[in-house]
Amino acid sequence: MARRDNDFYLDHNANGEPNINGAIFLDAAIGLDSRPYTYLLYGHNMKTGAMFGSLRNYENSAFYRKDPFITFDTMYEKGRFVVFAAGVVSTEESSDKYVDFYALKSRNIQGRQQAIDSLIGASTHSCEIDVEPEDQLLVLVTCVDKEEDRRVVAARRIRDGESEAALKKQVKRSW
């Protein structure tokens, strides 16, 4: 789902009807008319595991090693991504776990690299998957207990010529 603001789908479903669960939605600043550097998706952290309630599973190394890939298709293209970071980050600039989500959406290479490094630094586990600022990212974001904290799962698009089998071996060595 996409809209001009990031609040509507917090309490409306995909059909636009009021719903306490909301919907998973694309950041309002990201358009689908061109290929964005980053798909930034938000959803509620439901205790039932619905919406993005299951993102916490990626912080479990056994879960991640079993299937480190995410499929994300748009109406324009199919996408396969490999997870490189999962953990809790902060939107508070003074925090040591701060991630600049605006930089992830930017074309500024230095800012993107800093944001990628912050995601990797806040990850629950270290990972051997390399990530370049030119890579297309998929970042799934949900809330946690503290208002300024967010649970994230960050993945990069699998590059042309890369094999999922080789990437999975890298994952098994590191997590």
Model-derived regions, located:
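Solvent-exposed, non-transmembrane regions of membrane-associated and secreted proteins
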Residues: 1-175
